[in-house]
Amino acid sequence: MARFLNSNIRKFLTTQIRMSSDQLGELGKGAGKGGGGGGAVRQAGGAFGKKQAAEEEMYFKRKEQEQLSALRRHHQEEIDHHKKEIERLQHEITRHESKIKKLKHDD
């Protein structure tokens, strides 16, 4: 039941966000059209408003790229760690197998 509720809430919120973003208009075109009141320059609109909106978009895009890069690095480190762990366990398996062979030969 909780899964059903969560997916419905998620769909509702996604729909609401999508609908409200369609009503925003073009970024940097003045108050109420480009993401709300983003300061005096954004509210005034015009070339400076568009420039500020573009700079903000670039800032967030850059931040997103940095986060993705950090996430990729983290996952690669995890993969390397697990590969080393597999190698260590393979050596342990080989060691134990050799002990078993030695015990069989001693019989």
UniProtKB/Swiss-Prot annotation:
Compartment(s) of residence: Mitochondrion
UniProt KW Transit peptide keyword: yes
Classification via PANTHER family: ATP SYNTHASE F1 SUBUNIT EPSILON (PTHR48417:SF1)
Annotated spans, Antiparallel alpha-helical coiled coil region: 75-107
Keywords: Coiled coil, Mitochondrion, Transit peptide
Any GO molecular function: protein homodimerization activity
Domain free text: Forms an alpha-helical dimer with monomers associated via an antiparallel alpha-helical coiled coil composed of residues 75-107, leaving each N-terminal inhibitory region (residues 27-56) accessible for interaction with an F1 catalytic domain. The inhibitory N-terminal region (residues 27-56) binds the alpha(ADP-bound)-beta(ADP-bound) (ATP5F1A-ATP5F1B) interface of F1-ATPase, and also contact the central gamma subunit (ATP5F1C).
Stretch list, region Disordered: 24-48
Statement: the UniProt record of this protein carries the keyword DNA repair: no
Region (N-terminal inhibitory region): 24-53
Signal peptide per UniProt: none
Species of the source: Danio rerio (Zebrafish)
Biological processes, Gene Ontology terms: chordate embryonic development; erythrocyte differentiation; heme biosynthetic process; negative regulation of mitochondrial ATP synthesis coupled proton transport; protein homotetramerization
Family per similarity comment: Belongs to the ATPase inhibitor family.
Name of encoding gene: atp5if1b
Coiled-coil portions: 62-107
Annotated function: Endogenous F(1)F(o)-ATPase inhibitor limiting ATP depletion when the mitochondrial membrane potential falls below a threshold and the F(1)F(o)-ATP synthase starts hydrolyzing ATP to pump protons out of the mitochondrial matrix. Required to avoid the consumption of cellular ATP when the F(1)F(o)-ATP synthase enzyme acts as an ATP hydrolase. Indirectly acts as a regulator of heme synthesis in erythroid tissues: regulates heme synthesis by modulating the mitochondrial pH and redox potential, allowing fech to efficiently catalyze the incorporation of iron into protoporphyrin IX to produce heme.
Biased composition (Gly residues): 27-40
GO cellular component: cytoplasm; mitochondrion
Subunit organization: Homodimer; represents the active form and is present at a pH value below 6.5. Homotetramer; represents the inactive form and is present at a pH value above 7.0.
Protein's name in the database: ATPase inhibitor B, mitochondrial
